[in-house]
């Protein structure tokens, strides 16, 4: 029966290793994502008529890099794997094993943006609107890393493109990581970069990002397998959806505020 479905490609999560040092696909995907964000940010700085300098973008990307890494890891552990942390405190530091929370990473990036805005004496919303269109590609690369790591797969299904994941018991499952790659990494990227082609009120780009990501994440959660270690609310809403709802509301509030200020 399972012959009709797609076999998970056997990809070694480690690309190569030299002694105790190993380069993993998961880490490489993040580096590619940040590399692309850096390149795109520099390109936008050169076309910003002096609003941004390449030095300022360099500082912003570097600071946000650490915000994502630290916030993403801490968020994953505290939001989704707190019980495991209590059993094995060193789990927090084994980032190479995978496990990065977008919501934790977002908190880390917000802290980084506040610090950079203060240092550069610019509006927080100016910083947020600049960084938002740089994020989706990196999100998509992270989902590719999840796919290669054979983690965060979807629920059991009989769709023709179902994948037989080894850690999922070789049962046909939704490749939910690839759904998120397409929606969060590709579709959202084009939406935001189309949106910024015209002048927009301060905060509107960041607001649209929050709405777009959260709606896509909320929808994919319906086919993403529920982590048995993470509670749901009466089996009606997942932890990921619960964390996404405030972001949808917040994004809408920011958009309304941004456009109401413009009219005023």
From Swiss-Prot:
InterPro entries: Lgt. Pathway: Protein modification; lipoprotein biosynthesis (diacylglyceryl transfer). It is an enzyme of class 2 (transferase). It comes from the Bacteria. A 1,2-diacyl-sn-glycero-3-phospho-(1'-sn-glycerol) binds at residue 143. Pfam families: LGT (PF01790). GO terms for cellular component: plasma membrane. Its EC number is 2.5.1.145. It is found in: Cell inner membrane. The chain crosses the membrane at residues 14-34, 60-80, 98-118, 128-148, 176-196, 203-223, 240-260. The keyword Iron-sulfur does not apply. Signal peptide: none annotated. Keywords: Cell inner membrane, Cell membrane, Membrane, Transferase, Transmembrane, Transmembrane helix. One of its GO terms (biological process) is lipoprotein biosynthetic process. One of its GO terms (molecular function) is phosphatidylglycerol-prolipoprotein diacylglyceryl transferase activity. It is a multi-pass membrane protein. Its main location: membrane. Catalyzes the transfer of the diacylglyceryl group from phosphatidylglycerol to the sulfhydryl group of the N-terminal cysteine of a prolipoprotein, the first step in the formation of mature lipoproteins. Belongs to the Lgt family. PANTHER family: PHOSPHATIDYLGLYCEROL--PROLIPOPROTEIN DIACYLGLYCERYL TRANSFERASE, PROLIPOPROTEIN DIACYLGLYCERYL TRANSFERASE. NCBIfam families: lgt. This is Phosphatidylglycerol--prolipoprotein diacylglyceryl transferase.
